[in-house]
């Protein structure tokens, strides 16, 4: 199932808990269940493909990306026209009981000072053991997203299959714009997708079909930041406080005042960026999921909560161009840089 990662544009919660909340709501170090095995269901089975979420747990517009041959980023000889994925605005929220709410800032993640110093941001890395697996997310994934968007906006054939791993992951693609890094689009999926097709699809879906924003244009390219988030370590927990701000993303399921099942999610960086504690985050997520009744502690205890982690990489457009200068061959073909006068 797909989701959104973000929340309110330029909106901050007060330091006090939202209306209807209890106190400050610190994290609980242990579950309210009788045993660890009861509280954590371990790896979750991921839902079927196709449903897209916008980071808030709200349904996004549909649409996929185009297919394609090789695509240099300027009009070289032999580069065919056409190509690209879907356009148009997003559709309203629909089945699955997920509502779309005003967007919240998704986190910018780790920006790269130079392509050679590219590092990924992972909330789980600080607590990983020395033998933990190598990070999967890479700067090349963000470059591929920029390639896909550029080729779509200029009508070139889509880039060939990239060289990075094609393992399946739940994923999100987030776009921000300008010096203040305003949210410009954020859509992803909780269904594990092969990275080559998943990033190609959600690059265009998040850029063109996030129903909170108009489709992106060529003029916006130079001011964009692209983030790729790969979601990992899904765990069911019994206690709605059993997660760590800034480390875990959370996905909640609840029954609203009309008896309908609803879901909503925030990526790991959202609560930390907004300065929220556990209670504020849960209450905000309930509102984003469409819950309108007063929020009591008794109701919070009925929430089914899944926590997860993510690996995240962020690249600015300028860093993307610099990366391409140092990597002249991308996806197995020559990859000239786009003319700078396109963006002056």
Swiss-Prot record:
PROSITE patterns: AMMECR1 (PS51112). Residues 28-37 have a biased composition (Low complexity). Residues 130-324 form the AMMECR1 domain. One of its GO terms (cellular component) is nucleus. Pfam families: AMMECR1. The modification Phosphoserine is found at residue 16. It comes from the Eukaryota. Keywords: Nucleus, Phosphoprotein. Residues 1-39 are annotated as: Disordered. It is found in: Nucleus. NCBIfam families: TIGR00296 family protein (TIGR00296). This is Nuclear protein AMMECR1. It comes from Mus musculus (Mouse).
